[in-house]
C-alpha cells in the first residue's frame, strides 16, 4: 500500500495524474468514471457485467452498407489517404496460404484530441467526434481485419462495442486506471486498450487483462492478451494489445513495462508454445531498450513492418507525425511483433508519403489520428524446420 501511495504521489507531482477529475454529467458518464477506478472490486465487476451484455440479439450490420454510410457522412471531406498492400511472400511460394488480417491502431482518444494534445495545425472542426468517428470506422471497414487492436479508445461502450459486435466481432476493453481523459471537461470516460476478433474466424480460449508493472509498482498502462483458436485449422495463437508510457525521460519505465508484459506473455503462451502477435503503441523508437528487449526476447519475435524495408531489418521512418506547440514530432512508435518461427507475414499495408500526409501533418480532415494504422496479413508457417 505504501509503494502504491508513493507511485500515486509521484504521478501527481509530475502532473500526469490530477487530484481532481472533471465531474460526470450523466449516468453513462458516471459509469465510465467508476470503470476508471480499477483498484475497486465493484468497478471491476461493473466492467465485466457491461462486457457480458455485448452478447445481445441485435441485428447484424452489413459492413458494405455501413461503409457506404461512412462515405456519405464524409462526402464533404478530402479523400482518405491512399495506401497499397505490399506482398511479402517469397517468389518460390506456389500455394496461396489461408491468411488472417491483423490491424494495429492508436485511434487518438477524443478527449485528448480536443483537449490536451494541442494539435496546433489541425482545425478543431476536423477533430469533432460527429465526423471523426466515421473516418475511424471507414478505415476499419476498408481493411476488414480479422483481429483489431486499438489504443486510446474512449468511445468503447457507445460506439465501438455496439457497432463492431454487430459486425461479428467479439470485443474486450480495459481502461487505464487513471486515464488523462478524465481531466478533460466533457470527457466521455477513460481511454484504454481494446481487442476485437471475428467470431467466424476465431474462438476464444482464454483472456487475460494485465495491469503492467514497473518492477514492483503497478502502473497506469495496461494490456489485453487473448488466446484464440482458428476455426479453420484448430490451431491456437495468442494476441496481445498494449500502450506503453509516453514522453521523453520515461525510457527506463517503458523498459520495465515491456519486460513485465513479456514475462506475462511467456507464461500465457507456455514459453512460446502458442504463437504470439503483439500489437501496440510502444511510445519508443527502435533505438530504445524496450524495443531491443522485444527483438531479443526468448519468444523469438520479429517486427512485421521491418519486412517492408529493402534490407528487411529497418523499421519505417514514421508511424506518427504531428505538430504541437512544442514542435514537430515524426517517429516510429507503433509495432506488430509476431512469432517468426510459427507465423509468416504475407503482406503489409504501406505507409503514406510525406506529400500525402501534407504540411499540417496528422490528424487532419482526411485522417482521424496522429498515428497511422498498421495492417498485416499472416499465415501459419508450415515449414517444419522453422517450428523448432
From Swiss-Prot:
- Cofactor annotation remark: Binds 2 magnesium ions, but the ions are only loosely bound to the protein.
Which cofactor does this sequence's record say it needs? Answer: Mg(2+)
Entry comment describing in which tissues the protein is expressed: Expressed only in the photoreceptors of the retina. Expression is controlled by the retinal circadian clock.
Q: Where does substrate bind?
A: 152, 176-178, 220, 243-246, 281-283, 371
A biological process term (GO) from this entry: NADP metabolic process
Q: Where in the cell is it found?
A: Cytoplasm; Nucleus; Cytoplasm, Perinuclear region; Mitochondrion
What family does this belong to? Belongs to the CCR4/nocturin family.
Name the source organism: Xenopus laevis (African clawed frog)
State if Glycoprotein is listed as a keyword.
Answer: no
* Gene from which this protein is expressed: noct
One of the entry's Gene Ontology molecular-function terms is: metal ion binding
User: According to its UniProt entry, what is the function of this protein?
Assistant: Phosphatase which catalyzes the conversion of NADP(+) to NAD(+) and of NADPH to NADH. Shows a small preference for NADPH over NADP(+). Component of the circadian clock or downstream effector of clock function. Exhibits a high amplitude circadian rhythm with maximal levels in early evening. In constant darkness or constant light, the amplitude of the rhythm decreases.
Entry keyword set: Biological rhythms, Cytoplasm, Hydrolase, Magnesium, Metal-binding, Mitochondrion, Nucleus, Repressor, Transit peptide
Q: Name the top EC class.
A: hydrolase
Q: What is the lineage of its organism?
A: Eukaryota, Metazoa, Chordata, Craniata, Vertebrata
Mind telling me what this protein is named? Nocturnin
Q: What is its EC number?
A: 3.1.3.-
Amino acid at each position: 500500500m505504501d509503494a502504491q501511495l508513493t507511485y500515486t504521489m509521484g504521478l501527481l507531482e509530475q502532473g500526469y495524474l490530477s487530484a481532481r477529475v472533471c465531474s460526470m454529467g450523466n449516468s453513462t458518464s458516471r459509469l465510465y468514471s467508476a470503470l476508471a477506478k480499477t483498484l475497486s472490486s465493484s468497478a471491476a465487476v461493473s466492467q465485466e457485467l457491461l462486457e457480458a451484455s455485448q452478447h445481445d440479439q441485435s441485428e447484424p450490420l452489413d459492413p458494405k452498407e455501413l461503409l457506404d454510410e461512412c462515405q456519405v457522412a464524409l462526402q464533404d471531406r478530402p479523400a482518405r489517404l491512399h495506401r497499397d498492400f505490399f506482398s511479402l511472400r517469397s517468389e518460390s511460394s506456389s500455394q496461396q496460404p489461408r491468411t488472417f488480417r491483423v490491424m494495429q491502431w492508436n485511434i487518438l482518444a477524443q478527449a485528448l484530441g480536443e483537449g490536451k494534445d494541442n494539435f496546433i495545425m489541425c482545425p478543431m472542426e476536423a477533430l469533432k467526434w460527429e465526423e471523426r468517428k466515421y473516418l475511424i470506422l471507414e478505415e476499419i471497414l476498408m481493411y476488414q481485419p480479422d483481429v483489431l487492436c486499438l489504443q486510446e479508445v474512449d468511445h468503447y461502450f457507445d460506439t465501438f462495442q455496439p457497432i463492431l459486435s454487430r459486425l461479428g466481432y467479439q470485443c474486450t476493453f480495459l481502461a487505464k486506471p487513471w486515464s488523462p481523459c478524465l481531466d478533460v471537461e466533457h470527457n466521455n470516460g477513460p481511454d484504454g486498450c481494446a481487442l476485437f476478433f471475428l467470431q467466424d474466424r476465431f474462438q476464444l480460449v482464454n483472456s487475460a487483462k494485465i495491469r503492467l508493472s514497473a518492477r514492483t509498482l503497478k502502473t497506469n498502462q495496461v494490456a489485453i492478451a487473448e488466446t484464440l483458436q482458428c476455426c479453420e485449422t484448430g490451431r491456437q495463437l495468442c494476441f496481445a494489445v498494449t500502450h506503453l508510457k509516453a514522453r521523453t525521460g520515461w525510457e527506463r519505465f517503458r523498459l520495465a513495462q515491456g519486460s513485465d508484459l513479456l514475462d506475462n506473455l511467456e507464461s500465457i503462451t507456455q514459453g512460446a508454445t502458442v504463437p504470439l502477435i503483439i500489437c501496440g503503441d510502444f511510445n519508443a523508437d527502435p533505438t530504445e531498450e524496450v524495443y531491443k528487449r522485444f527483438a531479443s526476447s526468448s519468444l523469438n519475435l520479429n517486427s512485421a513492418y521491418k519486412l517492408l524495408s529493402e534490407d528487411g531489418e529497418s523499421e519505417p521512418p514514421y508511424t506518427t507525425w504531428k505538430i504541437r506547440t512544442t514542435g514537430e514530432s515524426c517517429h516510429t512508435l507503433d509495432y506488430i511483433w509476431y512469432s517468426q518461427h510459427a507465423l509468416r507475414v504475407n503482406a503489409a499495408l504501406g505507409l503514406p508519403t510525406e506529400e500525402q500526409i501534407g504540411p499540417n501533418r496528422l490528424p487532419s480532415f482526411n485522417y482521424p489520428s496522429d498515428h497511422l494504422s498498421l495492417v498485416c496479413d499472416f499465415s501459419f508457417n508450415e515449414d517444419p524446420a522453422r517450428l523448432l
